[in-house]
Amino acid sequence: MHIAVVGLSHRTAPVEVREKLSIPEELVERSFNNLKKIDQILEVSILSTCNRLEIYSLVKDPQLGIEAIKSFLLEFSGLEDEILSPHLFNYVQEKAVSHVMRVSAGLDSLVLGEGQILSQVKKMVRLGQDHHSLGPILNRLLTQAVSTGKRVRSETNLGTGAVSISSAAVELAQLKLGQAHGRDQLMTLETEKVAVVGAGRMSRLLLQHLQSKGCCSLTLLNRTRKRAEDLSAAFPDIQIDCQLIDELDSCLSLSTLVFTSTAANEPIIDAEKLINIDRKPLLRLIDIGVPRNISSDAKSVSGIESHDVDDLQEVVSRNQEARQKLALEAEGLIEEECRVFLEWWDSLAAVPTINCLRSSLESIRKEELQKALSRMGPDFSARERKVVEALSKGIINKILHTPVTKLRAPQSRNDRRDSLDVIEKLFNLDVSSSLNKPKNN
């Protein structure tokens, strides 16, 4: 068995490729079912965010398992192999373990230390559990990754002052406004006519950061008015005009700055729409949706300044050097957590031998107990029989305690293998046969 991860992220693929592998809610169950049908996969879960799609799995054979997952990604995305493959990465065993720990800690994020990824890793664990696709190995790994993410944020300064995708989007708007006025600095958004399209979690974060940057009024559009009004109620200090998304054209004509963050699978704004509306001389569009809410052809329209999640790098790079230094604090903790998991993983190699040894001694115990009880005759009471049986079980457990503890203790693979070989020879254990023996129903 091997732990493997296959996927792509903002580091390896542009948004136009990533959006092809964004898994909408309505396709999550089907995706899990298709992955579980793959013979090579023993356990699996999916991490899908705006910046990454990663399949974590326990596979029988690493090469065959990775190829099978790659085939799933090709079929799901509809992309040709020569287009998708250059953007995919895969890690096995130690590298896979280290990768998920780093992802959960925010070290692999566009914004170093951002907190939202931890919630997304928690969701990955929950999805795997809900779809009954996690076994003891991946469940232990992913649960420990969540704990590692929490530990990094509580024991280091990496999470202090970290920005999110939403805050970076607001900062990008401030930066572009400043550059338009000939200044390489962030400007307040007080005078901008702002609109936010979508009323989900990302939009909630957008509103938080817009409020902190001086925005005191905006238009909020959503597919359902109630959800927009519920979100609006959480921000009483902002004057929010809630509209249905049907009013998008009217909103675009009145706004100077529009943020989009919806779950739509196709663009809701394109060049044709922008050409056919009466709008302000300059309209800034910032799209943090994946798949993208704004078509790439919007950039070709005069008077339109359109940005997507990949453009956030301009903002992130302004303070990334300082955050890189903070990330060094987390590396030691991640190495420690990886070592703990791998020691546990290695200790599983002893389980078949321990089970075989326990079974062998249990057979001897039962055989010898039966001989002893038969000699006692009918005068031996049921209570006395229970006492003798408990005594025999206690002796076996005492005999097993020290060798089992030693075998499970942290040690090098070679040392553990040597110990297993000695025990198997001393007790004449046939571990391979016991593994292949069918279980009693």
Curated annotation (Swiss-Prot):
Pfam families: GlutR_dimer, GlutR_N, Shikimate_DH. The active site is at residue 50. InterPro entries: 4pyrrol_synth_GluRdtase, 4pyrrol_synth_GluRdtase_dimer, 4pyrrol_synth_GluRdtase_N, GluRdtase_CS, GluRdtase_dimer_dom_sf, GluRdtase_N_sf, NAD(P)-bd_dom_sf, Shikm_DH/Glu-tRNA_Rdtase. The record marks 99 as: Important for activity. Its EC number is 1.2.1.70. Substrate binds at residues 49-52, 109, 114-116, 120. It is an enzyme of class 1 (oxidoreductase). SUPFAM superfamilies: Glutamyl tRNA-reductase catalytic, N-terminal domain, Glutamyl tRNA-reductase dimerization domain, NAD(P)-binding Rossmann-fold domains. It catalyses: (S)-4-amino-5-oxopentanoate + tRNA(Glu) + NADP(+) = L-glutamyl-tRNA(Glu) + NADPH + H(+). Keywords: Chlorophyll biosynthesis, NADP, Oxidoreductase, Porphyrin biosynthesis. HAMAP family: Glu_tRNA_reductase. Catalyzes the NADPH-dependent reduction of glutamyl-tRNA(Glu) to glutamate 1-semialdehyde (GSA). During catalysis, the active site Cys acts as a nucleophile attacking the alpha-carbonyl group of tRNA-bound glutamate with the formation of a thioester intermediate between enzyme and glutamate, and the concomitant release of tRNA(Glu). The thioester intermediate is finally reduced by direct hydride transfer from NADPH, to form the product GSA. Possesses an unusual extended V-shaped dimeric structure with each monomer consisting of three distinct domains arranged along a curved 'spinal' alpha-helix. The N-terminal catalytic domain specifically recognizes the glutamate moiety of the substrate. The second domain is the NADPH-binding domain, and the third C-terminal domain is responsible for dimerization. Belongs to the glutamyl-tRNA reductase family. This is Glutamyl-tRNA reductase. It comes from Prochlorococcus marinus (strain NATL1A).
